[in-house]
Amino acid sequence: MNEVDPPPIAIRVGRAHQPLRRAVYEEVQRRIVDGRLQQGERIFEDQLAHELEVSRNPVREALQALESEGFVELEPRRGARVAVISTDRANDLFELREALEGMVARLAAQRRSDHQLHELQRVAALGAATAGTGDVASLPALNTEFHRLLCKAANNAMLADSVERLSQLIQWVYTKRVTQRGTKSWTEHQQIVDAIAEGDANRAFAEACAHISNARLAYLHDQLGAR
C-alpha cells in the first residue's frame, strides 16, 4: 500500500466503529457514485472481497442493500452488475429532487440561523471561485456540501432524512452535470442564498426549483444528444 491508497476496510471499520457490512456498503456505493464502477459493469463478489480484504459475506450483504436502493441489479445465476439509469428514471429523480429542494429552500429562508447563512454564503462563494478556476474535480464535493448545508438550515429532521436517503442516488445522476454546468450552477446557488438571506421564502422556493429544473433540462439534452 502506498501513501495515497486508502486504508483497508478493516482498518477503517476500527477507526469509525461501524459494522463491517456498513463499511463495505459505503465503499461500493462510493465507487458507483464516483464512476469507478460504471453503469452496467459486472461486479464479482470474490474480486471485491479480495480488494477490500474481507470475506464474501459482507460483500453479498452490501450488494443486496444496494440493490434495494437502485444502485445494483442482482441476476439469478449471473451475479451482480451496476444498475443502468434510464432517462425516465433519471427524470423521475430530478422531479422528486425539485419538489424536495424547493421545500428545503423555503424553510431555510424562514428558519436559518445567522451561522447557517454564513456557511451557505461561504460555500457558495468558494464553489463559484472554484468553478471559475476550472477545477472541476472539486465541484461535486462542494455541491454536496452546499446542499447539505441548505438542508440543515431548513431545520426539519424528517425532510432532512428524506433528502439524505436519496442523496447518493441523486448525486450519481448529478455528478456529470455538476462539473459541466460549472459557473451557471454556482450562480444559481448564489441566487438561492440571496433569497434566503432576505428571508424571501417564495423566491427561495422558486430559485431552488429553477436550479434543479435547469440541471434536469441539461441532463436530458445530453441524453438526447447521445442517441
Positions of predicted regions on the chain:
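Mobile beta-alpha loop/short-helix "lid" or hinge segments that flank ligand
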Residues: 68, 72-73, 165-168, 181-183
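Conserved amphipathic alpha-helical segments that form helical-bundle/coiled-coil interaction surfaces
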Residues: 93, 97, 114-175, 186-194, ...
